[in-house]
Regions:
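Short runs within selected transmembrane alpha-helices of multi-pass transporters and secretion channels
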Residues: 75, 144-162, 170-178, 199-214, ...
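Transmembrane helical elements of multi-pass membrane transporters/channels
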Residues: 20-39, 143, 177, 206-210, ...
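Alpha-helical transmembrane segments of multipass membrane proteins
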Residues: 37-41, 114, 122, 156-160, ...
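Residue-level signal for short hydrophobic patches within transmembrane helices
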Residues: 11, 15-34, 38, 63-70, ...
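Short alpha-helical transmembrane segments in multi-pass integral membrane proteins
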Residues: 1-22, 82-149, 191-247, 303-368, ...
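Small-residue-rich hydrophobic transmembrane alpha-helices
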Residues: 54-114, 151-170, 264, 277-335, ...
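Membrane-helix interface/capping residues of multi-pass secondary transporters
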Residues: 40, 51-54, 91, 120, ...
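Helix-terminus/linker motif at the lipid-water interface of multi-pass membrane proteins
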Residues: 30, 34-55, 124-131, 187-194, ...
């Protein structure tokens, strides 16, 4: 088998390699973001019901994020382990990691979708759905859950394509699905008059197409890492390794859901318009966060592969370029949204009151995210280097240790503004802490690898 795609991770010029590996993931995640953003844009502009429907979809996002988070155990934990195994020349272990990951995704689908179906309405009420929004929330989520397996495959297996140096394939899968979603949304929502149900159906169909492309590649002869029947049998040691490293990406994603529970619950007491405001602002925040997640998926295989081979100079160089790119993008994107909040809000709604509310709250909500690019880079580096414990702590720090308590405490002193301000304070504090931890440990980690 021709391993040129794998070998270039250890030999190609670094900056062009990072761009070649990361930009497809960046573009793919930016386009993938359209799955949720386009739904919200079209739903928010439905005449007469747009604001309530938007709040209903915002409530479901906490559950959807939690379900999708389980795929990060496989994608976020398994792909770096597979890259390290490839770097060490251990192909047998790399194949086994992928096979066990595939089996876990099927198990996660059955468990998460089943539990959600059974307890759907109580969960939505708990998160903050009101009498005015519960119908839209259940309509959307009921359809979305039928495509859980497709979402798991599309998000959990994509990283294994990047791990073997083929980011273009994963980008194609996401782009095709996203373009299909953009076309189906207005057709189902407006032409067929299906409303929020149509938006969910468009997403399910689009994710199914992406999943078929990804799985199709991973079972083909073009793949270095392949899904093979003999590797689907659970291996307790490998599954343990997946959980050990993947628990940090899982917590990063799942605590986003927990944050949604807390924020939506707090805001529901002030009125549905504040829940809709949060939905708009979180969507805007994703314009910076989600594409950079795709960028990180591109440079993580480079770091993992070279760390496995002991090429620590290339690890350092990859970090240098990556942190500059990620910090700059995060800062510029957030500054734009803070400066023009009402313009951003107008993308999602025609409701004047909602646009003005977003205009007041957006600076409070996003200011701390301006330096978050530092944390996102350092956190991804820890995952790439197999530092599960540090990654786990950082994942817990921002959302569980800082954001959730702040979101519960600050409103007692600042009212509804305190709910939004909690995000900025937590983001800035955790970014500073994470960068400090990375500065103190990075050299030690690489030095230890050089001595083995």
């Amino acid at each position: 088998m021709d391993n040129k795609y794998e070998e270039r991770l250890g030999t190609a010029s670094m900056l062009p390699l990072i761009l070649k590996m990361a930009l497809p993931g960046f573009a793919a995640q930016l386009i993938n973001l359209l799955y949720s953003i386009v739904d919200r844009v079209f739903i928010g502009h439905i005449e007469h019901i747009g604001t309530d429907a938007l709040a209903g979809i915002g409530v479901t996002s906490s559950i959807i994020i939690l379900i999708s988070a389980f795929s990060q155990i496989v994608g976020g934990g398994g792909a770096p382990l597979a890259s390290i195994a490839l770097g060490k020349g251990d192909r047998e272990r790399a194949h086994s990691i992928l096979g066990n990951g595939f089996s876990l995704l099927v198990l996660f689908t059955v468990v998460t979708s089943g539990i959600t179906y059974i307890f759907m309405e109580p969960l939505l009420r708990l998160i903050g759905a009101s009498d005015a929004t519960i119908g839209y929330a259940t309509d959307y989520l009921s359809v979305y859950l039928t495509g859980t397996l497709f979402v798991m495959f599309a998000t959990g297996l994509n990283s294994f394509i990047n791990a073997q140096g083929r980011p273009g394939i994963s980008m194609i899968a996401v782009i095709i699905g996203a373009i299909l979603n953009i076309g189906l949304d207005p057709l189902f929502i407006y032409v067929f008059g299906m409303g929020v149900t149509g938006a969910a159906l468009a997403t399910v169909i689009s994710q199914a197409v992406s999943a078929f492309i990804i799985v199709g590649f991973l079972v083909s002869d073009k793949a270095t890492l392949k899904i093979k029947p003999k590797y689907l049998k659970p291996d307790i040691k490998i599954i343990g390794s997946l959980f050990a490293l993947g628990i940090a990406p899982f917590i990063m994603a799942s605590t986003e859901s927990l944050v949604g529970f807390v924020l939506n619950g707090s805001l529901s007491g002030y009125g549905d318009i504040y829940v809709s405001t949060l939905t708009v602002m979180q969507s805007a925040m994703q314009f910076a966060a989600v594409p950079l997640s795709g960028f990180a998926q591109g440079f993580v295989p480079i770091v993992s592969y070279n760390y496995g081979k002991g090429n620590t100079d290339r690890v350092r160089l990859c970090f240098k370029y990556s942190v500059i790119i990620m910090f700059s993008f995060f800062a510029l994107t957030n500054l734009f949204m803070i400066t023009f909040p009402e313009f951003v809000a107008g993308m999602f709604t025609d409701d004047t009151a909602l646009i003005k509310t977003v205009g007041r709250m957006m600076p409070l909500f996003l200011t701390g995210m301006t330096i978050f690019g530092l944390q996102r880079t350092c956190q991804s580096m820890f995952v790439a280097l197999g530092q599960a414990k540090i990654s786990l702590f950082i994942a817990l720090l921002r959302k569980v240790i800082l954001l959730i308590p702040l979101a519960l405490i600050l409103p007692n002193f600042l009212g509804v503004k305190g709910v939004y301000l909690a995000e900025s304070v937590a983001d800035a504090t955790s970014a500073i802490c994470c960068t400090t931890i990375f500065a103190l440990t990075f050299r030690k980690i690489l030095k230890k690898r050089e001595q083995t």
